[in-house]
Amino acid sequence: MKKTILTAVAVGLIVGFTAPAANTAPAANNERGTINWHDCDAANQEAGATLEGYECGTLTVPLDWDNLANPANAQIAVVIHRTTSPKRIGALTFNPGGPGISGISRAKEYATLIPTKIFTAFDFVAWDPRGVGLSQPQLVNCPAPSAPFPPATGPVDWENYVTQTYDIVSAANKPCLDNNKDLAPYLGTYYVIRDLEAMRVALNFKKWNFMGDSYGSRVGYWYAREYPKSLRTLVLDGSYSPTLTATSWLAEQSYSYSSAQTVFTSLPGTSTPWKLQRIFDALNEREVLVNGITSSRWAVAAEFFSLVPYQLYYQQIVEHINIVYDALFNPNKPTVPPSAPIDNEETTANELSILHVVNCRDLTDYPTIKEIAAAAEAASFTSMGTALQIVQDGVNCAGFPDDFFHGYLPATGQLRLKNSPVVVHSIGDPL
């Protein structure tokens, strides 16, 4: 979670005024287009805290927005904190990224970090995209792929490693698709933005404000293209390129992570980039023992570089660099524990399956093994962490048929919104 978006929210949202107005709900099939309000027990559990002052409900929408005759529905979990301020501006919602991350699980986090002046001026809406968190239905019986790191030391045959990883992920993706034939085709941003529009109508908002982080920028961008009159303001952080394909993502990730690494190493002082380079030069030839745990260059890279874009964690990353450096070059020096552990969130099996299905539903032009290997090898000369990330992203669609794509072709032209969108950290930020 980056605090940068919250500054942008303050800039982007205090623009104009939006008062609530009535809307006519779309034609409903049974309860389609309506919200069933109920207790917040499940939402509190999902959020990991009591959502005081929130109303909790479930929005019913068609599973297949392209065929409303299909009787199957999806249930979208939604919570709302209604402002009582006489200076109410409108409604604010968000998507925290992923794909596969629950908005309800991040409701308290976002609400706490948003400046009070902003939060109290809006009805605040959090929701779980279809297939995520409390929303139903969900993917079932999807194996979790577990790919090994490349060789601990020495040169890497990137094509061989990518082939191995591709086969492992393919062996998980194929049964996931087979076990979810009635759901997987209806997961993707194409459907999410239609659910989002149905939610706006059901909540009786003439317009609302959207902030999207990481993958949430894809949701916000395509929602703005499809429903420009439904948005008052749009704030995108760590934004994906609207021209993104599954293959061009490899180059974008390489550039973004390398840029983020450059920013990080330029700030903590001259000794940090020198230490970092010396660490990885040494780890190319041997592993390191830290606090009784043996780690390879890949484990160290994964720990450090996954959080490079987060300036909030710079101090902890510097501390961990010093610990690894001393373990390698000053083994007799007493180990000083970091002031706080690096918080690398684990990705659940469901989140990983959703990530693969949604990205491969959204993005065309799946990369080949040779393309992934070439991109990873090129990145490895400057950043091992970037190389690992490229392989991870590149094999997303292993095992998916080429015609699984059902989203939007790379965009051309500009968004046409009354208020210009605020886009932050679109370069040098992989998140």
PLM feature segments, named:
Residues V140-P151, G220-K275, N322-N332, S339:
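A catalytic-pocket lid/entrance helix-loop region that shapes and gates access to the active site
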Residues K2-T7, A21-T163, L276-I279, F405:
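Catalytic-loop region of hydrolases
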Residues Q311, G428-L431:
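Acidic catalytic loop of the alpha/beta-hydrolase fold
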Residues P175, N179-D182, I193-K207:
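Conserved acidic catalytic loop of the alpha/beta-hydrolase fold
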Residues L417, V423-H425:
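Short beta-strand/loop motif that positions the catalytic acidic residue
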Residues A8-G16:
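Bacterial N-terminal signal peptides
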Residues S102, R194, G212-A224:
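Glycine-rich nucleophile elbow surrounding the catalytic serine of serine-hydrolase chemistry
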Residues T272-K418:
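Alpha/beta-hydrolase fold active-site neighborhood
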